[in-house]
Amino acid sequence: MAEFKFTDLVEPVAVDKKTALRITVLGGGSFGTAMANLAARNGCDTMIWIRDAETAEEINKTHINKRYLPDFTLESSLRAVSDLEQAVCDRDIILVAIPSHSFRDVLKQIAPYITAQAVVSLTKGIEAKTFSFMSDIIREELPEVPYGVLSGPNLAKEIMAGMPSGTVIASDSELVRYAVQHALHSALFRVFGSDDVHGVELGGALKNIYAVAMGIGAAYKIGENTKSMILTRALAEMSRFAVKQGANPLTFLGLSGVGDLFATCNSPLSRNYQIGYALGSGKTLEQASKELGQTAEGINTIVQVRGKAQELDVYMPITNALYEVIFEGAPPLNIALSLMKNGHRSDVEFVLPHHEV
């Protein structure tokens, strides 16, 4: 395998011409582990940073992430480390798969050491206190570093099982897009490019809201017609909100929008779907979260997006109904009722002029 640097990339690299980029994934959850495994399988010099030293040592010995992906064997070349400085020094790309509530703190910690030419967020969420997207946080904490976001319908267990999947790398830098495609693209995992960073990021964050709604609906055994309404009205809400945030609503027609929405809303593998199902089955939020044992970004996103939508005067009835059900004790039937409000609005709203949406 030839030695290779990030800055050597000047054009897309064919799948059969892999060279050894140095990749680090920060965060040992299911998706971070899946992306690290893909990079290692593609021949990249790959590390995964995990806070707990014992867990990192166990992964290096067994090549299994027992907590998140116990049924899959990882590439033997993938190295787990618990030292953050070691993880980020002299690397070409840092992929950050840290929950949104800890994202900024980890970037602050790596700032003195980072020598990477690109930092890419894998996190689908919004920072609670500031309503900042992960790309905003990267720009604030690492202002000199090229950045991007990776998002799409990427259920980790399906990727690990080798099922054909795709994702989107969004960045203002063509070089960052090429580098991430080079590191992760394979015969079974296609990486598309985009320059609409906020659009791709919004799709990844907002769809978590509606996965919670679909999980609640599944617990009530809703029909296919109702599921279709949830999906399409969710897409309308997402596009309305995206326009107010300066994103291109047409981005939501791609993998990072409707693709991710469909996968997350229809899969029992989705954490947000699972927590919704638990809530619909009569459990409290605390009980559901404890039972899941992982972070469900959708719950935090519901709170943040509802507040921002009220501030911006964006009509988001499903999001409002979810908030009322989860935090105010309203009956889950309110979610279904939210689909039937507001008379005869246009079906495909995001193709209308903005003042008509």
UniProtKB/Swiss-Prot annotation:
UniProt: sn-glycerol 3-phosphate binding residues: 124, 152, 207, 260, 270-272
Chain positions recorded as NADPH binding sites: 30-31, 51, 124, 156, 271, 297
Enzyme active site: 207 (proton acceptor)
Subcellular location: Cytoplasm
GO MF annotation terms: glycerol-3-phosphate dehydrogenase [NAD(P)+] activity; NAD binding
Pfam families xrefs: NAD_Gly3P_dh_C (PF07479), NAD_Gly3P_dh_N (PF01210)
Keyword annotations of the record: Cytoplasm, Lipid biosynthesis, Lipid metabolism, NAD, NADP, Nucleotide-binding, Oxidoreductase, Phospholipid biosynthesis, Phospholipid metabolism
Coiled coil feature spans: none
Record keyword S-adenosyl-L-methionine present: no
UniProt xrefs under InterPro entries: 6-PGluconate_DH-like_C_sf, 6PGD_dom2, G3P_DH_NAD-dep, G3P_DH_NAD-dep_C, G3P_DH_NAD-dep_N, NAD(P)-bd_dom_sf
Superkingdom to which the source organism belongs: Bacteria
SUPFAM superfamilies assigned to the protein according to its UniProt record, in alphabetical order: 6-phosphogluconate dehydrogenase C-terminal domain-like (SSF48179), NAD(P)-binding Rossmann-fold domains (SSF51735)
EC id: 1.1.1.94
Alphabetical GO biological process terms: carbohydrate metabolic process; glycerol-3-phosphate biosynthetic process; glycerol-3-phosphate catabolic process; glycerophospholipid biosynthetic process
Endpoints of the signal sequence: none
The reaction(s) this protein catalyses: sn-glycerol 3-phosphate + NAD(+) = dihydroxyacetone phosphate + NADH + H(+); sn-glycerol 3-phosphate + NADP(+) = dihydroxyacetone phosphate + NADPH + H(+)
Record HAMAP family: NAD_Glyc3P_dehydrog (MF_00394)
Family in the record: Belongs to the NAD-dependent glycerol-3-phosphate dehydrogenase family.
Name listed for the protein in its UniProt record: Glycerol-3-phosphate dehydrogenase [NAD(P)+]
Species the sequence originates in: Acinetobacter baumannii (strain SDF)
Gene: gpsA
